């Protein structure tokens, strides 16, 4: 990809604390989109390696909430990601296979219908309902992203479900296929942006942020590097610390309303072809008891510490095919707030729980007997606010900005999040959704009241 330099102009020193996807996207928007120079990123490790590469790499514009802010924000981010895909001959392997939400509970049919109608009202595209065997439906293509359909298709005719999604559990009674959704290579998206910012002269200082010189405004960032302390002059500081964001924010006297939730994913070679290579992202909406054989149940019953595996597991197990033969599954069945620590503690039985949970939705995966072949587990932390909306923009300390709380949607939101930070810093026109992501929203009494009745926060 050839990066045409934007019109450069004299600009203040900008230090971005963190070179995960949020920090790199901010640097990209500042330098490539706005022509800003004098940008430095500070990162203690390898850029994009702490948690940015530990996701399902998926995206969607299907978001609940009391207004259209998240849908508009994600639509903008997807637009910008598609621009990168077009400019690089789709080096980032972007597809638009969609997200399929499925249930075996007829009581959830009104929920799926309402979600589709709400998404339509929020600007997410038309809701289409398929209640008879003759209803017309156009499947999403396996490859590419220039696909006209948006919105969602809601199926309640089981013969149609069997025709178009034959791999789903025969107990499935309803499906919603959100269409402006799919996945990409997060590694390649990050690499494209990182290459571009380096070409624009952005320097990456390897070190740990240990202090920020700020009274009423920021002046410098203190970095510990190779046993020495380095002071980086700064007129603007962007805190994009991912799991370390709370620690960084306290350096300027901020106590951010964010918590950390641990998440994992398992990838394994699907040698038995349990999940078809053409499948979309699949999400099971029902609570469940994991499927165990009688022999397994008897063995587990004898182990007091393993009896919790007989309990009720939450809705939300989801997975997708990955490349020619692998399958990825996420099942975040423990959502408690924790303090981020690295390396990530191991989660007992995770691969088996995830595979068994997913096999409830896709019975062909039961062929593995709950034992995936050569499973690879990684994970990270979802840094999130109570209502699961990000924090993007200026804070009370002049010259300081935050780009954080991207929860499980950091990859898909990265381009719009970076653009929003760049617009705040450069003083250019802000989009309508900008106020929805400011830290100052929590000072608004009406917003605080809305938090008490927020409803679905959209986290998978």
What kind of region is each of these model predictions?
Residues 6-22, 40:
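Beta1/beta-strand and adjacent pyrophosphate-binding region of the FAD-binding site
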Residues 31-53:
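Glycine-rich FAD pyrophosphate-binding loop
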Residues 57-160, 164, 314-317:
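Dinucleotide-binding Rossmann-like beta1-alpha1 core, especially the glycine-rich loop
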Residues 72-75, 102-109, 176-195, 343-352, ...:
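Short beta-strand to alpha-helix junction loop
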Residues 147-163, 337, 348-415, 419-425, ...:
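Flavin (FAD/FMN) cofactor-binding core of flavoprotein oxidoreductases
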Residues 169-171, 175-236, 240-243:
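Helical element adjacent to the flavin cofactor pocket in flavoenzyme catalytic cores
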Residues 227-299:
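Central helical "cap/lid" subdomain
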Residues 271-398:
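Active-site lid/adjacent beta-loop-alpha segment flanking the redox-cofactor pocket in flavoenzymes
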């Amino acid at each position: 990809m050839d990066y045409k330099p934007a019109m450069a102009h004299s600009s203040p020193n900008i230090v971005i604390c963190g070179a995960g996807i949020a920090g790199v996207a901010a640097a990209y928007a500042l330098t490539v989109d706005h022509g800003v120079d004098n940008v430095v990123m500070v990162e203690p490790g390898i850029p994009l390696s702490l948690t940015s590469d530990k996701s399902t790499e998926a995206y969607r514009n299907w978001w609940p909430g009391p207004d259209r802010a998240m849908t508009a924000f994600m639509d903008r981010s997807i637009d910008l990601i598609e621009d990168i895909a077009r400019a690089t001959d789709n080096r980032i392997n972007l597809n638009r296979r969609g997200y399929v939400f499925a249930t075996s509970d007829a009581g959830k049919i009104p929920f799926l219908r309402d979600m589709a109608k709400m998404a339509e009202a929020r600007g997410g595209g038309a809701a289409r309902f398929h209640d008879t065997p003759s209803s017309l439906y156009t499947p999403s293509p396996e490859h590419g992203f220039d696909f006209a359909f948006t919105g969602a298709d809601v199926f309640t005719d089981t013969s149609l479900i069997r025709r178009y999604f034959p791999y789903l559990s025969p107990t499935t009674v309803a499906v919603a296929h959100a269409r402006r959704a799919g996945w990409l290579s997060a590694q390649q998206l990050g690499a494209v942006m990182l290459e571009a910012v380096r070409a624009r002269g952005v320097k990456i200082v390897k070190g740990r942020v240990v202090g920020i010189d700020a009274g009423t405004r920021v002046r410098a960032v203190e970095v510990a590097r190779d046993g020495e302390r380095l002071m980086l002059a700064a007129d603007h500081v962007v805190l994009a610390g991912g799991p370390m964001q709370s620690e960084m924010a306290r350096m300027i006297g901020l106590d951010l309303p964010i918590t950390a939730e641990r998440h994992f994913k398992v990838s394994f070679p699907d040698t038995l072809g349990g999940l078809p290579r053409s499948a979309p992202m699949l999400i099971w909406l029902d609570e469940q008891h994991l499927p165990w054989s009688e022999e397994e149940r008897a063995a587990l019953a004898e182990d007091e510490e393993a009896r919790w595996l007989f309990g009720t597991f939450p809705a939300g197990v989801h997975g997708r095919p990955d490349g020619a033969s692998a399958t990825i599954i996420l099942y975040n069945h423990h959502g408690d707030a924790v303090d981020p620590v690295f390396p990530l503690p191991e989660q007992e039985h995770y691969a088996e729980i995830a595979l068994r949970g997913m096999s409830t939705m896709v019975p062909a995966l039961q062929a593995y007997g709950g034992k995936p072949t050569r499973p690879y587990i990684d994970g990270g932390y979802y840094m999130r606010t109570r209502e699961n909306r990000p924090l993007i923009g200026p804070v009370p300390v002049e010259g300081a900005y935050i780009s954080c709380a991207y929860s499980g949607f950091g990859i898909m939101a990265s381009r719009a999040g970076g653009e929003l930070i760049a617009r705040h810093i450069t003083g250019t026109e802000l989009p309508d959704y900008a106020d929805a992501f400011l830290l100052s929203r929590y000072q608004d009494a009406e917003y605080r009241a809305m938090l008490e009745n927020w409803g679905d926060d959209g986290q998978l």
